[in-house]
Each structure stands twice: as structure tokens, then as C-alpha cells.
From Swiss-Prot:
UniProt keyword annotations, A-Z: Coiled coil, Cytoplasm, Endosome, Membrane, Protein transport, Transport
GO biological process terms, semicolon-separated: ATP export; late endosome to vacuole transport; negative regulation of protein polyubiquitination; protein modification process; protein targeting to membrane; protein targeting to vacuole; reticulophagy; ubiquitin-dependent protein catabolic process via the multivesicular body sorting pathway
Regions annotated as coiled coil: 272-300
Compartments in which it is found: Cytoplasm; Endosome; Late endosome membrane
Compositional bias of kind Pro residues: 178-201
GO (cellular component) term, any one: ESCRT I complex
Protein name per the record: Suppressor protein STP22 of temperature-sensitive alpha-factor receptor and arginine permease
Organism the protein comes from: Saccharomyces cerevisiae (strain ATCC 204508 / S288c)
């Protein structure tokens, strides 16, 4: 990181790194952060994507960080080694794989007494101690490189490391995470070449940093960059269109929901307004009736205070002048009562409340009583007429 707090990795590399990490790794955020921090601290390292073949033969596209690790700041230390660090898809749960970059490894230019020879197996894999005691919560890619650099500082061993010869093609490195051909008995004897590997389809992922100027011409390099930029632009446009469609869909749904909510509120307001009006009308009617009752009560009280009903004989008011008229009054009232009773029985019969035999029996009895009552009424009224 520079003095002004910015990373020294180019912005194009940062964008490419973020783009290729997200679909491959389970914890893309941690992988991107640790990889970017490693590239920012060690400028001799470069990122790329390659097909990694596991021990069971399963191929997988992974991020690999390659370059030269040395004890000197300028990379000119005699104890320097080209390495490739493969970041597994389960990182940081699983530690990275680190091996010697056999493409750039030259036994004639590297010291014969490599300090880390005891950690290198016959296939070129480097078994660092940190990888055996890996702690996902406390360790990262920078610590792996730092441990490798610290091991390069150690005094050299007596015997030179026995490394496999450089493979003939880059395809062999991408196809297998070795096995490689057996090491030669003498560094002066050329080992027999291994049989050519079966062809492996090229990976569809584009590498921004993995471009060798010795293998391709500047024109091809420029065309590849243009193709990469075209792919990135297409992906960007697809993402923008997808996000815009999602936002438009959600916006439409939210607008419809808001409109329905306003409609419900308007309906509830109208209902409440109607209820309030009904309550006001009912209150007005009740108040008017209360006023009428209050006025009538006042009239009754006034009449009671001014009248002399208590002094009058009640019998003189409610009783007729003769006994015959009093008897006639009672008989007429009894006749009306019998008529109402017969009509009530008839309605009960139609409703099925009483059975027919009960209706007939009770109706006959009531008719007999009514006949007698009317006969008495006729006897009383005959002399009067």
C-alpha cells in the first residue's frame, strides 16, 4: 500500500480479480481481500486462473498466484524460487497449495543448496509447516509467503534438492498437479521425456495477468485485451439490464401495493365518516326525544300539582252509574279477549306450534264461552234498545 493509503495494484487488475473470484469461491469476500493484500505487498507476484486437477482427477478452475519469492528486495537474492500458489474454492477453510513453478525453474541459474529442500517433495509441492497447522481464523496468504521467505533465510542444507526436470509444455503443468517424471540420477544426464499428455480443453476463463510476451505477438496481445474488454462490457451490460429489470419490477409491485393501500385507506375513511354521521344523527334524534320527554314530564308534574284528583272518588270515575252497565262493560271486554284468544290459537296452528286436536278442543271451549258471553250481552242490551 502506498503512502497515501491506496493500494498499488492497478484498478483493472482489482476489477478482474473481483470478477473471477465471486463465482468460484464460497467465501468470495475473504478470498478477494487476502489475494489483493498479497499482490499489494509482494509486487513480484501475479494473478491468473488455471484449471487445477485434484488427486482424484477432478478438474476445477481456480485462482493461482505465481511469481518469484526471494529474500532480497530486488529479487536478485541467490535464494529465490519461482512458485505457484493455488487458492482452493473452500478458502479460507482449506489452506492454499503451493508448488515450484516448473515453467520458470532453471537448475543452472538457481543455487544448488536450496534452504527449503527438505519441504519439497519429488513432484515439486512445498509442504510448509503453516499448511499443516492451518487456522482459518488467524492465517492468510501473506503469512504463507512470509513463512516461505523466512525459510529461505535459513542456512542451506548439505545436499542439493532433487527436483524434477522442467516439463516440455505448459499444457502438462495445467493438466496435472503432478505426477512428474522421476528425477534423474545425475544432473548432467538428460532424463527420458515423458509420454505426451492427452489433450485437455482450454479453460473458458480469461486471464488478465497471464500473458507471456515471448509466446504471443503484440498484435495478438492487443486483440486479446480487446476481446477481454468486450466480454467485460457485455457482462456489465447484462448485469445492469438484470438489475434494472429487477428494480423496475419491484418498483411496479411497490407502486401497486401503495395504490391498493391508499384505496383501502380511502374506503375506511368513507366508512368512518358515514359512521360518524349516523352517530351524530342518532344523537340529535335522542336529544330531541329527551327534550320532548322532559317537556311532557314537566306538564305531568304541573298537572299533578294543580289537579284535585286525590279528592275525587275513583269509583265514581271508573264505574258506570248502574250495575247493569258495569256488567255489560265486563262482558264486552271478555268477548274481545275470547276473540283474540281464538285468533292466537289459529296462528299457532298454522305455525305448527300446537297439534290439530288441541286446537279443536280449545277452540270449541272458547267458542262455547264466547257464545254465553254474547248471549248475556244481548239480554242486557235488549231492554236498553
Amino acid at each position: 500500500m502506498s503512502a497515501n493509503g491506496k493500494i498499488s495494484v492497478p484498478e483493472a487488475v482489482v476489477n478482474w480479480l473481483f470478477k473471477v473470484i465471486q463465482p468460484i469461491y464460497n467465501d468470495g469476500r475473504t478470498t478477494f481481500h487476502d489475494s489483493l493484500a498479497l499482490l499489494d505487498n509482494f509486487h513480484s507476484l501475479r494473478p491468473r486462473t488455471r484449471v487445477f486437477t485434484h488427486s482424484d482427477g477432478t478438474p476445477q478452475l481456480l485462482l493461482s498466484i505465481y511469481g518469484t519469492i526471494s529474500t532480497g528486495e530486488d529479487g536478485s537474492s541467490p535464494h529465490s524460487i519461482p512458485v505457484i500458489m493455488w487458492v482452493p474454492s473452500m478458502y479460507p477453510v482449506k489452506p492454499p497449495f503451493i508448488s515450484i513453478n516448473l515453467e520458470n525453474f532453471d537448475m543452472n541459474t538457481i543455487s544448488s543448496s536450496l534452504p527449503i529442500q527438505e519441504y519439497i517433495d519429488s513432484n515439486g509441492w512445498i509442504a510448509l509447516p503453516i499448511l499443516h497447522c492451518w487456522d482459518p481464523a488467524a492465517m492468510n496468504l501473506i503469512m504463507v509467503v512470509q513463512e516461505l521467505m523466512s525459510l529461505l533465510h535459513e542456512p542451506p542444507q548439505d545436499q542439493a534438492p532433487s527436483l524434477p526436470p522442467k516439463p516440455n509444455t505448459q499444457l502438462q503443468q495445467e493438466q496435472n498437479t503432478p505426477p512428474l517424471p522421476p528425477k534423474p540420477k545425475s544432473p548432467h544426464l538428460k532424463p527420458p521425456l515423458p509420454p505426451p499428455p492427452p489433450p485437455q480443453p482450454a479453460s473458458n476463463a480469461l486471464d488478465l495477468m497471464d500473458m507471456d510476451n515471448t509466446d504471443i505477438s503484440p498484435t495478438n496481445h492487443h486483440e486479446m485485451l480487446q476481446n477481454l474488454q468486450t466480454v467485460v462490457n457485455e457482462l456489465y451490460r447484462e448485469d445492469v439490464d438484470y438489475v434494472a429489470d429487477k428494480i423496475l419490477t419491484r418498483q411496479t409491485v411497490m407502486q401497486e401495493s401503495i395504490a391498493r393501500f391508499h384505496e383501502i385507506i380511502a374506503i375506511d375513511k368513507n366508512h368512518l365518516r358515514a359512521v360518524e354521521q349516523a352517530i351524530e344523527q342518532t344523537m340529535h334524534s335522542l336529544n330531541a326525544q329527551i327534550d320532548v320527554l322532559t317537556a311532557n314530564r314537566a306538564k305531568v308534574q304541573q298537572f299533578s300539582s294543580t289537579s284535585h284528583v286525590d279528592d275525587e272518588d275513583v269509583n265514581s270515575i271508573a264505574v258506570a252509574k248502574t250495575d247493569g252497565l258495569n256488567q255489560l262493560y265486563n262482558l264486552v271486554a271478555q268477548d274481545y279477549a275470547l276473540t283474540d284468544t281464538i285468533e292466537c290459537l289459529s296462528r299457532m296452528l298454522h305455525r305448527g306450534t300446537i297439534p290439530l286436536d288441541t286446537f279443536v278442543k280449545q277452540g270449541r271451549e272458547l267458542a262455547r264461552q264466547q257464545f254465553l258471553v254474547r248471549w248475556h250481552i244481548q239480554r242486557i242490551t235488549s231492554p236498553l234498545s
